[in-house]
A protein has these predicted regions:
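Acidic, Ala/Val/Gly-enriched low-complexity intrinsically disordered segments
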Residues: 8-15, 23, 27
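Arginine/glycine-rich "motif VI" loop of SF2 helicases in the C-terminal RecA-like domain
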Residues: 88, 154-162, 188-190
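Active-site/ligand-binding-proximal alpha/beta "capping" segment
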Residues: 123-158, 165, 217-222
């Protein structure tokens, strides 16, 4: 059973301001305020192993069952759809943010508690970051990598102090972590930079830490990106 309310599509400009208000008025009377809000980056494909979709669903269930809110890219395909569906089914709120150009390609999820349609990828990422209190990267492709690295860079530069997690399911990110250590050994990354990302293979343990530490503020200065 879905708990998502009727979505409101928000376009940029003056109209979007009104629509954002309507979303808020629609949602508040029926749902409790979330105790934390985790932005999940993940693939719009399901991947070769069914375990990836199961992992995304497990992540969404945990968020919903613990009174949280999912912020994500607004699509219904792949891991994105799996994490959103599971959050909704577990009673959680889901905030989807998707560019107009991807509404058809990524099949915008009309069951979201809030579904914001924006013009650009920059607007998408900034709104997702602003609505989140923590970030988590699941397995995915270059879009997932780009979002993860940008969020990490923003943290390094001091634009936010929100926790960042990397779920290294079944060694999916082993190669990436090895390369990052290589970059550090070659002097391109400071030793404390890796400490800004919480890496774990167990979703529940990682999610608990992210939810518990989700109290950092996202600086408006990040809008310059």
């Amino acid at each position: 059973m879905q708990t998502g309310l009727t979505p409101v599509f928000a376009a940029p400009g003056a109209v979007s301001s009104l629509l954002f208000i309507l979303v808020s008025l629609n949602a508040c009377p029926f749902m409790k305020e979330p105790t934390f809000s985790i932005c999940v980056y993940c693939g719009s494909r399901s991947g070769a192993d069914p375990a990836f979709a199961a992992l995304a669903a497990q992540t969404g269930r945990w968020i919903g069952q613990h009174g949280g809110q999912l912020v994500y890219g607004g699509g219904k395909n792949g891991l994105m759809g799996a994490v959103a569906d599971a959050t909704l089914q577990a009673g959680g709120r889901v905030i989807g943010v998707i560019p107009q150009a991807l509404v058809e390609r990524e099949h915008a999820h009309r069951g979201c508690t809030e579904l914001h349609v924006v013009q650009t990828m920059h607007e998408r990422k900034h709104l997702m970051a602003a609505r989140a209190s923590a970030f988590l990267a699941l397995p995915g492709g270059i879009g997932t990598f780009e979002e993860f690295f940008e969020t990490w860079t923003w943290r390094q530069l001091g634009y936010h102090a929100k926790p960042i997690g990397l779920l290294n399911h079944d060694g999916f990110y082993d190669g990436l972590l090895s390369f990052l250590r290589h970059s550090q050994a070659q002097g391109f990354m400071s030793p404390d930079l890796m400490a800004l990302v919480d890496v774990d293979t167990h979703p529940a343990a990682l999610l608990e830490r992210l939810a518990r530490g989700a109290d950092g503020e996202f600086s408006p200065l990040a809008a310059v990106f």
